UniProtKB/Swiss-Prot annotation:
Species annotation: African swine fever virus (isolate Tick/South Africa/Pretoriuskop Pr4/1996)
Protein name as catalogued: DNA-directed RNA polymerase RPB1 homolog
EC number: 2.7.7.6
Pfam families from the UniProt entry: RNA_pol_Rpb1_1 (PF04997), RNA_pol_Rpb1_2 (PF00623), RNA_pol_Rpb1_3 (PF04983), RNA_pol_Rpb1_4 (PF05000), RNA_pol_Rpb1_5 (PF04998), RNA_pol_Rpb1_7 (PF04990)
One of the GO BP terms on file: viral transcription
Amino acid sequence: MEAGYAEIAAVQFNIAGDNDHKRQGVMEVTISNLFEGTLPAEGGIYDARMGTTDHHYKCITCSHQRKQCMGHPGILQMHAPVLQPLFIAEIRRWLRVICLNCGAPIVDLKRYEHLIRPKRLIEAASSQTEGKQCYVCKTVHPKIIKDSEDYFTFWVDQQGKIDKLYPQIIREIFSRVTYDTVVKLGRSKNSHPEKLVLKAIQIPPISIRPGIRLGIGSGPQSFHDINNVIQYLVRKNLLIPKDLQIVRGQKIPLNIDRNLQTIQQLYYNFLLDSVSTTATQGGTGKRGIVMGARPAPSIMRRLPRKEGRIRKSLLGSQVWSISRSTICGNSDLHLDEVGYPISFARTLQVAETVQHYNINRLMPYFLNGKRQYPGCSRVYKQITQSVHDIEGLKQDFRLEVGDILYRDVVTGDVAFFNRQPSLERSSIGVHRIVVLENPKISTFQMNVSACAWYNADFDGDQMNLWVPWSVMSRVEAELLCSVRNWFISTKSSGPVNGQVQDSTVGSFLLTRTNTPMGKNVMNKLHAMGLFQTTQTDPPCFANYSPTDLLDGKSVVSMLLRQTPINYQRAPTWYSEVYAPYMHYNKQDISTQIRNGELIEGVLDKKAVGAGSSGGIYHLISRRYGPQQALKMIFATQQLALNYVRNAGFTVSTADMLLTPEAHQEVQEIINELLLESEEINNRLLHGDIMPPIGLTTHDFYEKLQLNALKFPDRILKPIMNSINPETNGLFQMVATGAKGSNPNMIHIMAGIGQIEINTQRIQPQFSFGRTLVYYPRFALEAQAYGFICNSYIAGLTSPEFIFGEMNGRFDLINKALSTSSTGYANRKAIFGLQSCIVDYYRRVSIDTRLVQQLYGEDGLDARQLETVRFETIMLSDQELEDKFKYTGIQSPLFEEEFSRLKKDRDKYRQIFLNIENFNFSQLLTDVRQVPVNVASIVKNILLSSATGVLPFDEKTILQKYTMVKTFCKNLPYVFINNIQERLQTPIPVYLKRAASLMRMLIRIELATVKTLNITCEQMSAILDLIRLQYTQSLINYGEAVGILAAQSVSEPLTQYMLDSHHRSVAGGTNKSGIVRPQEIFSAKPVEAEQSSEMLLRLKNPEVETNKTYAQEIANSIELITFERLILQWHLLYETYSSTKKNVMYPDFASDVEWMTDFLENHPLLQPPEDIANWCIRLELNKTTMILKSISLESIINSLRAKHPNTYIMHSVENTASGIPIIIRIYLRESAFRRSTNTRMATDEKIAVNVVDKLLNSTIRGIPGIKNANVVKLMRHRVDAQGKLVRLDNIYAIKTNGTNIFGAMLDDNIDPYTIVSSSIGDTMELYGIEAARQKIISEIRTVMGDKGPNHRHLLMYADLMTRTGQVTSLEKAGLNAREPSNVLLRMALSSPVQVLTDAAVDSAVNPIYGIAAPTLMGSVPRIGTMYSDIIMDEKYITENYKSVDSMIDML
């Protein structure tokens, strides 16, 4: 009978009590001795019944040697009970809620029935139980005191009498608690409080605390420190009387009390970390013991941190052997190959089983042995099941079938290639090894175009390479991890690889028209030479004579014909910026490939560059597969490099030098900038700079200087006039996108300009008012603040060089500080989303809990998308009718078709206009990513079977229309199956929506007016191809889309921070780049957000186009507190008087004059009789009042309304220049009265509190709006003719701070278009669905053009809002989303605390996701392991055919 097997479905965590320990223990430890002679002492802590780690003796329990014995726990019977150190807080809770006399609950259990189970005991223990009377025995419950000096001691304070609660007494109290009480308080029966006090503790097996014996008998020996702790524990336990009885309130001998405390401390150190080697630590009472010069180790110390058991041993994967070396480039290698040094190949070994078909191939390895490469090192003999070293074999040793030969690595073996940090799944790829025979080479070599997978370069990067051993692992590696699988990026949906640098320039030069001196025109022989290293099928040159000339386009077309595609796009080479300064050949302005023939244009970055979405390699991959695209990249690269080697290409200093005339023109431009900067300085010195609302004079001055010192676009003119674009290598690299940019070219040739650090000029931080030692204090010239006039080629002065290095130093420090934050954020994202897996319905779920009804709302794989343009979106009604309405046949079907196209257009506009209105920067566009490029399929079908324009009858046209209509109707059945399509079962609404964008595109591209020259057979083929590609583009079952989303978002976010030093020297770095992502992913509340903003549209259309009116409204909503309007204030203790004689403070004697005038001008505002002796004197800032448009009258009225217990006097508003506006606020006696109307003593604290309230008083505006400025928006709207019009003259208000509700109450603000960046504020006002959309838009806004595919953003948003509340990606959010997945939360952080809480709650952890199965030693159910494979062994046996039987049949 065969034994069955089963997978672990769930794990339950419980508190282990005495009975559990006794049941699991195989022996009882009674003595502290380790050994008796050479054998373990019986009953000692090294008893052989607990296992063995020594080859001298076997385990008595299982009779196995040390390699096979897993170890067995023992027990130590305590003479006196001890508290379980992990559950001290739980013990305290139970003591607070149960009667110490009878064990009945003190609290009313019905009050806590509505709470979830884990919260009941916690809430009950937090209630007031001191002095309560027990419902059963009427005993008054005492006060439970936890000793502040001792972590383990509890005291009872009952009517002033304080008694110590020893563990034995606590155990007796807990033994009276009924199971019914335990369950009603939310705990499981398995978590009875009696288990929290132990009489028998478990001793761990010897295998986890091994000893190292350095000799036999009396020789030296060394043991694990934890054994010493156990020894002390046993010895101290023997000092306690066995029958010790402790009665509550009775004192025990001091020596016994100390021994009990020491035992408790030892048990704590045995389980948990020792926090200190001193007597106590910070008053916590956690004492520490010392083993030599270090704290004692513990069992729980092995779990947390990177080196702990969980992350290092259980979640981490270790390989037997691995190689690591520096990488360098080698263009002769394919993208899927890696050059491997021969010294490494002779060290790493590959295990290969000898079979009939490979014994002849393996025999040379066996004969070469270790002497010659390729050889082998060991042989595993199947008959004897033993391993033999190849050098120690006898002469008669034979290699037989079934043996395993450990041979050297040879060319053609597959290997894993990895670069850390592994932020994406493409960071581990499988390559084919090419052994480098040169013994001097010791580096890995790879194709330059392959670096994109690993984000690697050749500046000293090191990578890892290891070879899978078994046949199964080699096959799995090649199928699942081959680099061809990573060619299309999951993050951006575009190709990862392409031509870079030299090969990009070479492709451009080869395909140019009319190259100088005809360098890309060659004869037959030279053309054949270019193909020599492409490793493709050579094109046929038989039709060319030796005298025929071929240009570069013809040569490239010979290669492209092997994978015919159609391509049309403007190249990077053509730019409107360069057009005024250089002549473009008309044939190079647009690149067009027709059926594999390069008709016109050039190949540059946009066509063949790395990461070019929609480029040539992307199209080849979509039509012919990624393997063919990689071959084409290599072949094109070889063509380009071979051409560059022959024709020559270089960048020299001559390419960087300006002509004297151009240099003079550059200097004139720079002088103009410096003059403008000097004018701004003069305005500052004369006080003529008036900053707008929200900016200080200094900030506005710095902003003016930054704008004035920016290089204008016309600085390119002298550069372009001094170079020859046809021959200048530097310009050609920039213009083709191979390397560099316009700012780089300007910095090299013209000037560097203003250096910015954190978006600011260099600040005077060297000393007071000084930027560097080279400039005097308070210098205002632009050069003193980081403006560099010279270029790199001209050379920098000392201060200019220092300014440039300042930015580099800031970036390096910023990178170092951000690495840890982004790395941990990546890890939290991985753990937070890893349980999200696609099921058989293409839903995303966590175990059985739904996250997305359909992955990405359309069920598509992000790697299977193309960018297409929807032609109808930007057309007006009349244009749409002219272009798409078929009028050749009078039929209601074509009216229906046009009506459907118009509805599709309007629906598209409605959706994306709404998105535009509620996002800061996302504008409507007619370009979208879809799984099928219908226009390309139609073009390919027509080119492959050209029929010309043929007349078709009405029946054929109607038939084609019906075919398209039926196809669009049935397209959503792709998500279900063919059976449901045949039955025409109802389609769920969400599936119809998923296919809506694709159906719109099909109706546009297959409209009747566009398919007149297509036959019905061609139409059928087109629809079949569309369906096939659409089906292949669906996400696979079992895909771990959560991890894909985490990688796709975290990697560019991490790279955004780490690449700060790669930005332009004058671009600077914004240190707040990491703040906003942390706010989003941490789900911070509104009050904790540092960078929240609002965008407010105005209700009145006329005001919306008037910047002045918009600014007035912005002023009115900006929060102005009284404190912002004050220059200085004084709190005076003086008696009110209107004469100079009684003024206590002579410095303010002049106030009497305006106070007298105030009383004369305001006869109704005479001082009251109850004025106290406290006065608040304030001087107002007239400049701020003018800028904020606030009058003195409005300030006074606001203060009087909010503070009636004061008497306010003020000077006139229109004072002379230099004379401030003064307000005196006298406190009245009522401000110093209690609610009982009794007079309080005059107190300075009360007066200070009144001052604080006055300063924080709101004068005007909406709370939360710190600043408000007018910004110009670009938005779309549909006019009366149905045309989409772009509006550029709309003004809106952008605020710093958020308060949606307050903004909705303002009559000038349109409440329907309020946009806030705050997720919390949006959630509070609009609900969870609005918060979900806000998460998506905020991540997209933060990441900008580096953002990933929106499906990954949807994954984040749906997971964070799945519970109905916005949960963070932090530990707290994971606890809320997956409270039952204890193993996952334990793997993330704080494993000891997570395990403790799980045991208290008796948590049941179902095994799902990735971390939990991995920790349990099983295979996660994802990817190819998601689907179960059922094999009929009986059928295979019955139908098995041997080679001989097949030959007989033939």
